[in-house]
Amino acid sequence: MARSIRKGPFIDHHLISKVEAAIESKSKKPIKTWSRRSTIVPEMIDLTIAVHNGKDHVPVFITDNMVGHKLGEFAMTRTFKGHSGDRKAKGK
């Protein structure tokens, strides 16, 4: 279910304040955040945000195609190592 338009996008206050500070200082340093639930807004374009995936911070460079999505969508939390193959086929 989508969020109501009248409410606007959800962004944590501490994250938006860090974004505004980075824009003011024109800093290219990654902004570290644990807020995977925050929506990407147009002010974040061309910034690098390091999103926590449960283990470490994954740097995500924000482009215009990402606007409207959540930060957590771009930092995978699970690593897929691949299914084990058929052992008989490997031996031949």
Swiss-Prot record:
GO terms for molecular function: rRNA binding; structural constituent of ribosome. Pfam families: Ribosomal_S19 (PF00203). One of its GO terms (biological process) is translation. The keyword Ribonucleoprotein applies. The keyword Ribosomal protein applies. It comes from the Bacteria. Keywords: Ribonucleoprotein, Ribosomal protein, RNA-binding, rRNA-binding. Belongs to the universal ribosomal protein uS19 family. NCBIfam families: rpsS_bact. Protein S19 forms a complex with S13 that binds strongly to the 16S ribosomal RNA. This is Small ribosomal subunit protein uS19. The lineage of its organism: Bacteria, Pseudomonadati, Pseudomonadota, Gammaproteobacteria, Legionellales. The gene is rpsS.
